[in-house]
Amino acid sequence: MAQVPAGKNRSGQLSKQTGDAWENQARRWLEGQGLRFIAANARERGGEIDLIMRDGAVTVFVEVRYRRSARYGDAAASVTPQKQQRLLKAARLWLCRQNGSFETVDCRFDVVAFTGNDIQWLKNAFGE
């Protein structure tokens, strides 16, 4: 019988691995759409940004969501107002570290949602 290392949460590890795989797929898909990769899993106080991309001169903060099926709603619907606020805060802090702000940098918030085999790209899904 396999043992889970002390202090490790196996289901949490699997969730992280699954999330990383979908984020990588979203990155490749967005690059195929012409966006340029900047960063992944940018952690700031209060939140994490899955992907930061560039679409021309626009900085794009991307939230990636996955649901196996739409039984309880599609993946895009899981980006709650609370999650949006955390992403806005994280993006504001990330921009500040880059010597920018929402006032000086053209940016938007996109959601790439995988529900089963379907992909949905919601450009400018929310904002401040």
From Swiss-Prot:
It comes from the Bacteria. Pfam families: UPF0102. Residues 1-20 are annotated as: Disordered. CDD domains: PoNe_Nuclease. GO terms for molecular function: nucleic acid binding. NCBIfam families: PRK12497.1-3, YraN family protein. Belongs to the UPF0102 family. This is UPF0102 protein KPK_0567. The lineage of its organism: Bacteria, Pseudomonadati, Pseudomonadota, Gammaproteobacteria, Enterobacterales.
